[in-house]
Amino acid sequence: MRDPVETYMNLVPMVVEQTNRGERAYDIFSRLLKERIIFVTGPVEDNMSMLVVAQLLFLEADNPKKEISMYINSPGGVVTSGLAIYDTMQFIRPPVATLCTGQAASMGSLLLAAGEKDMRHALPNARIMVHQPSGGFQGQATDIMLHAQEILNLKKRLNEIYVKHTGQTYKAIEDALERDKFLTADMARDFGLVDKVIDKRAEEPAAPKAS
């Protein structure tokens, strides 16, 4: 059976551009990285988190003042992996603009909300879902109690992050995250998870005419 990662990489389109040294081929994601675009796609886990963090740090080193665009289509995943991305977004100097395409659920919604203020967007048919963290553990009773307390600590910390980025009260966040809460793009805007719902790319201003 073929490695699914190898199969996926074989499906990634290659693009060719002309440089002063001749033609150069890139996979499409590397080419978009040159335009300072990062993709957070699929489940949030350690390997994906490591790649996103590395790209954020690389783009900061390339230009510490120019904005980074993060396109999110994720069902969420591991809390600590998501927090690694979140902390790096807050740590680096360039502003990070976020855009939800498809879905931003669980940790995906937190990363969407964590973008720079007034630079958090969703496409019209995007779906956003927020909820409290979940987990399971087997073992000795004392260890189960310790893990349960850790989940409660994470829940409190995640609630505080949502409060910071949405402007909602802690009680409102706690109530909203008590169960899976599904939001349309417009509802996510009203809740403070995004700043604007966009359906078209903003047009570039016309160049001034020569006198």
Curated annotation (Swiss-Prot):
Record text on subunit structure and interactions: Fourteen ClpP subunits assemble into 2 heptameric rings which stack back to back to give a disk-like structure with a central cavity, resembling the structure of eukaryotic proteasomes.
PROSITE patterns (alphabetical): CLP_PROTEASE_HIS
Please state where this protein is localized. Answer: Cytoplasm
Q: Which family does it belong to?
A: Belongs to the peptidase S14 family.
What is the protein name stated in its UniProt record?
ATP-dependent Clp protease proteolytic subunit
Task performed by this protein: Cleaves peptides in various proteins in a process that requires ATP hydrolysis. Has a chymotrypsin-like activity. Plays a major role in the degradation of misfolded proteins.
- Could you tell me the Gene Ontology terms of the biological process aspect for this record? protein quality control for misfolded or incompletely synthesized proteins
Which residues does the Swiss-Prot or TrEMBL record annotate as the active site? S106 (nucleophile), H131
Task: Name a single GO cellular component.
Answer: endopeptidase Clp complex
**Record-linked CDD domains:** S14_ClpP_2 (cd07017)
For this protein, the record's NCBIfam families field holds: PRK00277.1, PRK12553.1
Q: Listed GO molecular functions? A: ATP-dependent peptidase activity; ATPase binding; serine-type endopeptidase activity
Identify the main location.
cytoplasm
Q: Which gene encodes it?
A: clpP
| Coiled coil regions, renumbered to chain | none
Pfam families xrefs: CLP_protease
Tell me yes or no: is Hydrolase among this UniProt entry's keywords.
yes
Task: Kindly state which keywords UniProt assigns to this record, in alphabetical order.
Answer: Cytoplasm, Hydrolase, Protease, Serine protease
Report the catalytic activity: Hydrolysis of proteins to small peptides in the presence of ATP and magnesium. alpha-casein is the usual test substrate. In the absence of ATP, only oligopeptides shorter than five residues are hydrolyzed (such as succinyl-Leu-Tyr-|-NHMec, and Leu-Tyr-Leu-|-Tyr-Trp, in which cleavage of the -Tyr-|-Leu- and -Tyr-|-Trp bonds also occurs)
Q: Does the keyword section mention Cytoplasm?
A: yes
The organism of origin for this protein: Nitrobacter hamburgensis (strain DSM 10229 / NCIMB 13809 / X14)
EC number from the UniProt entry: 3.4.21.92
Check the record and name the InterPro entries matching this protein: ClpP, ClpP/crotonase-like_dom_sf, ClpP/TepA, ClpP_His_AS
